[in-house]
Amino acid sequence: MTKPLRIGIVAGELSGDTLGEGFIKSIKAQYPDAEFVGIGGPKMIAQGCDSLFDMEELAVMGLVEVLGRLPRLLKVKAELVRYFTQNPPDVFIGIDAPDFNLRLEKTLKDNGIKTVHYVSPSVWAWRPKRIFKIDAATDLVLAFLPFEKAFYDKYNVACEFIGHTLADAIPMETDKIAARDLLGLEQEREWLAVLPGSRGGEVALIAKPFIETCQRIHKQHPNMGFVVAAVNEKRREQFETIWKATAPELDFVIIQDTARNVMTAADAVLLASGTVALECMLVKRPMVVGYQVNKLTGWIAQKLSITEFVSLPNVLAGKELVQEFIQEECHPDFLYPAMEKVLNNDNRELIEKFTEMHQWIRKDADKQAANAVLRLINKETAE
């Protein structure tokens, strides 16, 4: 009797738990007896993953927080190394969380276990020399975007472009009317979605210039509605405080819902850079991108950066499709004219380009990831 397929897997945050869930489902569709063990969140556990530690153990952000938790993180890593070397899986998958997973993958690879890193770190954008560490730690990288694979190919590092899970999740055509109904927004108004970031540090720097931009837009478009996506109660309160101090006369509808629903309900979007810009492209809404970090972080990022663009739609297109304003340029003097241009344009060509790019990265990423891993360990795949 053949032994069931055994896969080691570690996800470090909620987004990784979602990727892990889809990956496990796709493997089990082909190998129903497959076993999964490592660290997962509630979604992975519901699919049958045996989680040896709570995923929260790995969910630390920022240098100070990481330093405070370092002894515990090192202990978890040592325990996982001991477990997997004593009970070797057919393959180990590290999902995102590169600071933790790449170190774990390197040790496991050195012990003869095949390793895969799922979600490429942004080596194509900054600190490109990390690619040598990735090569030493992995047998294969699974990349969401085609330019990531092109970067790995340049260095002869094994990588497969699997498409993006967001491109699979978001329909080719989104329903603005249904989104407005869902969020309770007036159908007959024009709406601008405002997304000033999901982290406290982002909102602290980006909300004010975004609100001041809305002030200027309101003068030209007095009937325009402004709808803000807040990821949680803390960000809602933070935005409200900045709004009341900056432009109390303006009306904002603040919604604690997914950014995707808020963008779908809007006619145009003013957003902080990040995955949300890709999501905005996929819901086919014209956008202007603004981003700001503290001056020291910005200076360091500028020195280490190797890309011309910050927002994913532009990086993906290899040219400026959407205007982006970074650091000092994240100011109403720049944001307002760009936003006016978007609001006074039919944006048809841009939406056509967004649709073309959506099709390009829509490949059933869960299935592609599963098949790439199965090929690595010489298992049959359902193409």
Curated annotation (Swiss-Prot):
GO biological process, one term: lipid A biosynthetic process
Tagged with keyword Cell wall biogenesis/degradation: no
Reactions catalysed according to its record: a lipid X + a UDP-2-N,3-O-bis[(3R)-3-hydroxyacyl]-alpha-D-glucosamine = a lipid A disaccharide + UDP + H(+)
InterPro entries: Glyco_trans_19
Top-rank taxon, per record: Bacteria
GO cellular component, one term: membrane
Keywords assigned by UniProt, alphabetized: Glycosyltransferase, Lipid A biosynthesis, Lipid biosynthesis, Lipid metabolism, Transferase
Keyword Plastid appears in the UniProt entry: no
GO molecular function, one term: phospholipid binding
Pfam families given in the database record: LpxB
Record EC number: 2.4.1.182
Coiled coil: none
Pathway annotation: Bacterial outer membrane biogenesis; LPS lipid A biosynthesis
HAMAP family assigned to the protein according to its UniProt record, in alphabetical order: LpxB (MF_00392)
Function: Condensation of UDP-2,3-diacylglucosamine and 2,3-diacylglucosamine-1-phosphate to form lipid A disaccharide, a precursor of lipid A, a phosphorylated glycolipid that anchors the lipopolysaccharide to the outer membrane of the cell.
Family of the protein in this entry: Belongs to the LpxB family.
Name of this protein: Lipid-A-disaccharide synthase
